[in-house]
Amino acid sequence: ALGRVVIYMDADFRGGAEGSYTPRLRSAYVSFKGLTLGRDVTTFCDLQAAPTTIDFQGPNAYNFNFATMIRYEVSFARRHMTFGVAAEMPNVSATYGENFKPMHQRVPDFPMYLQYAWGDDRSSHIRASGVIRNPYMHKVSKNSTTSLLGWGVQFSGTIKCCDWFRLFMNGVYGEGITPYIQDLTGSGLDFTPNPEDPSLVRMMPMWGWQAAGQINITPRLFVSGGYSTLRVQRSHGYYTDDQ
């Protein structure tokens, strides 16, 4: 028997340009026996590691993005530990220049995580996550395809320090992982050409972190605030000063 089967779908009106109110399908999946099939928030995202914010997207170093996936999750050690792994449709955002062209991707992204939770209601946790990517591109000069290796790691969590204060955090580092850092999504910086030799491309190293706190004034009233930052680093001179 399949046991409990969940069929879920949700949508909003943020699918077009800002202020356009274009309908958008966010999630649509079937979940059973630890398997999730369909479209959901990426497995690399720790949904409980960011505070409630006025900004819909959350902190700029967070990663609240959606992907089409096959995911498996399992809890063990009296539900203190949870492991998850997925194959997700890749979303490549790169700067190709004149010597390379985009193409259909052949290999899915592979995000995974291991989480430890504690407390009577398991309301505090820390999580280690990783992702491996293999984006493909077409090399014009040789009329052939080539690929690069992208990867990322993340530490995240939320800690209930006491009844009136909760801490949120995440830190991420990797190469070519713009879909997994909120404000870099769609930036064209997964990989870029070498300004001195446009026939070469390289994955760009990037990192970000955020930390925030929530103060519960009453059971129904709270305030939250935090700090978040991110950066794309140079890699052997790749990407120019004005980017």
Give short role names for the model-derived ranges.
Residues 60, 102, 201:
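Short, surface-exposed alpha-helical recognition segments that flank or form part
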Residues 121-242:
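Detector for outer-membrane/organellar transmembrane beta-barrel domains
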Residues 6, 93-96, 100, 104, ...:
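C-terminal/domain-terminus segments
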Residues 101-107, 184-188:
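Short, surface-exposed, charged loop/turn segments at secondary-structure junctions
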Residues 48-49, 84, 94-100, 138-142:
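A short secondary-structure junction signal
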Residues 1-93, 106-107, 111, 115-119, ...:
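Outer membrane beta-barrel
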Residues 12-24, 101-103, 133-146:
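Outer-membrane beta-barrel proteins
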